[in-house]
């Protein structure tokens, strides 16, 4: 798995881990932040969220074009600096007035621009490492490992966001309750119903920070303190970027030969031989067809920060008991994820000593995870953002499983091509949303709840199961798609084509808002049903053009 990979892969992967940790910490609380601070509706919040995600993934198109001319490393460094300023602006506490909104949108613009310069170009540099014939056969597994490293950062992000939010909110004598922000805004806006006012009063009575406050004062104070706690959560991203820069520059000698522009790559024999116009056209056409398909995958997948977060808040139990508790402790998840790698090491090691050491480590990690679980309270309170740690956990834990399966198939000459894996990923994604559809059948519509939490709450295991299946889909589609772009893109347009991959992701992220717009208008199962249909139609399309896509890698 890690054997015979160039050192540059690990340096670039770790640098990306730090940046992604900050990004996903911010993303875990962003939707909740704008609803709590500004009182935005679900439709407006998901629209802002989707536009931001679209910008984050669209800007790499321009970043890639620029990097093809001036070099990938220069763009990566500039991107980190711009992102840092953006996160710093987002971390500054402001009021919910116009100036606060302007600063927030300016911060989002800076983060999107910085990400555009950083994200795609770092991955092009990873791909450049594998233009060396010595490492060419390792390209697909390298991008799976790189993708796994991204998700290590993402796995810890929701827990960090939760810890920071709870710490600063707790210092003011408050605790997080999902009902309060919406009820507080209704109270301040004069639209609260009598029964909801009674509910808000009951919640306020249970908090020491509300002592001596009338309901209006409590509402404003709670919103202010919660918003400020979120601001501090955004500040974590600044720290993670500093770590990312330190890794990038301290290990730069490991990948310096991959830091070139398009002309330098050709001059140094870094890229493959010049393609004919017909070959170039064939490859670009194949890539554009793949880009068209992945739009709908990302539209569905990135509901994790939009409608799936709303579903976690309004329809899912806020406490867990029994064995499910282990999934809501980041340390136990980390130990379990690491144990997967040591277990594989025990089977794959070529020496008896290596097998023994890996076996002992696996047992120790399992005992550690059980010790963490045994020390947890009988009932654990959870936040909506906690669910976002499951997807990266599953990515980290399942990556070696995925590599082992496809490695075994490759030895038999039966490994599916990258385009075929993408098509299978779309089908698996449809299965994931089918689980959520079934769970939603007997639940009240969001419109009927009027901004409150449903009286009928489902087990968190429904959402966890959905995240598990969607992760299988993601592992089939995302790292394989990036590897496909890296392999098929004409040498002159590597940065631009990687940027187009992210531009397709951007369009999918913009379309994330469509289910959000439907959220308060249709039944829950209709929201998930739309995503199922889109995933299945996309799978049908990609399988219908499979021969064209597979032939592009041969020309």
Language-model features: locations:
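Hydrophobic core of transmembrane alpha-helices in multi-pass small-molecule transporters
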Residues: 17, 99-121, 445-476
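Intracellular loop-helix junctions on the cytosolic face of multi-pass helical membrane proteins
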Residues: 1-7, 132-140, 162-379, 402, ...
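Central cavity-lining transmembrane alpha-helices of secondary-active solute carriers
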Residues: 47-68, 155-157, 389-406
């Amino acid at each position: 798995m890690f054997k015979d990979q160039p050192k540059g892969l690990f340096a670039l992967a770790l640098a990306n881990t730090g940046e992604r940790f900050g990004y996903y910490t911010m993303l875990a609380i962003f939707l909740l932040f704008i609803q709590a601070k500004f009182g935005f509706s679900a439709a407006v919040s998901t629209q802002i969220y989707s536009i931001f995600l679209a910008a984050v993934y669209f800007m790499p198109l321009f970043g890639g074009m620029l990097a093809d001319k001036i070099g990938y490393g220069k763009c990566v460094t500039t991107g980190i600096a711009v992102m840092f300023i953006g996160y710093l602006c987002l971390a500054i506490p402001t009021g919910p007035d116009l100036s606060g909104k302007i600063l927030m949108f300016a911060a989002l613009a800076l983060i999107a621009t910085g990400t555009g310069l950083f994200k795609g170009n770092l991955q092009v540099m990873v791909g450049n490492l594998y233009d060396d014939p010595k490492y060419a056969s390792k390209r697909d597994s390298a991008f799976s490992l790189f993708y796994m490293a991204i998700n290590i950062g993402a796995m810890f992000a929701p827990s960090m966001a939760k810890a920071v939010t709870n710490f600063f909110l707790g210092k003011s004598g408050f605790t997080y309750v999902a009902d309060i922000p919406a009820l507080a805004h209704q109270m301040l806006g004069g639209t609260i119903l009598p029964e909801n006012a009674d509910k808000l009063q009951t919640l306020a009575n249970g908090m020491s920070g509300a002592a001596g406050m009338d309901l209006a004062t409590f509402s404003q104070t709670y919103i202010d303190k919660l918003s400020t706690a979120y601001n501090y959560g955004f500040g974590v991203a600044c720290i993670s970027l500093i770590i990312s820069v330190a890794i990038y520059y301290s290990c730069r000698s490991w990948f310096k030969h991959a830091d070139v522009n398009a002309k330098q790559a050709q001059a140094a024999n870094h890229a493959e031989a010049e393609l004919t116009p017909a070959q170039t056209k064939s490859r670009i056409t194949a890539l554009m067809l793949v880009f068209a398909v992945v739009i709908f995958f990302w539209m569905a997948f990135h509901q994790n920060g939009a409608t799936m977060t709303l579903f976690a808040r309004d329809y899912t139990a806020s406490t867990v008991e029994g064995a499910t508790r282990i999934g809501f402790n980041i340390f136990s998840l980390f130990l379990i994820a690491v144990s997967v790698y040591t277990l594989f090491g025990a089977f794959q090691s070529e020496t008896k000593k290596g097998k023994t050491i890996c076996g002992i480590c696996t047992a120790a990690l399992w005992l550690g995870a059980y010790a963490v679980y045994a020390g947890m309270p009988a009932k654990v309170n959870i936040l909506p953002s906690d669910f976002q740690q499951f997807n990266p956990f599953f990515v980290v834990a399942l990556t070696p499983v995925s590599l082992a399966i496809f490695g075994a198939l490759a030895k038999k000459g039966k490994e599916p091509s990258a385009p075929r894996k993408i098509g299978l990923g779309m089908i698996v994604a449809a299965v994931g949303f089918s689980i959520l559809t079934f769970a939603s059948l007997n639940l009240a519509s969001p419109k009927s709840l009027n901004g409150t939490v449903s009286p009928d709450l489902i087990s968190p295991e429904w959402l966890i199961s959905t995240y598990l299946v969607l992760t299988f889909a993601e592992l089939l589609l995302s790292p394989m798609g990036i590897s496909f772009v890296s392999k098929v893109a004409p040498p002159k347009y590597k940065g631009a084509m990687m940027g187009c991959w992210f531009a397709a992701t951007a369009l999918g992220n913009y379309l994330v808002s469509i289910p959000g717009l439907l959220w308060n208008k249709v039944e829950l199962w209709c929201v998930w049903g739309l995503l199922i249909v889109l995933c299945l139609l996309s799978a049908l399309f990609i399988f219908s053009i499979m021969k064209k896509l597979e032939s592009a890698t041969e020309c």
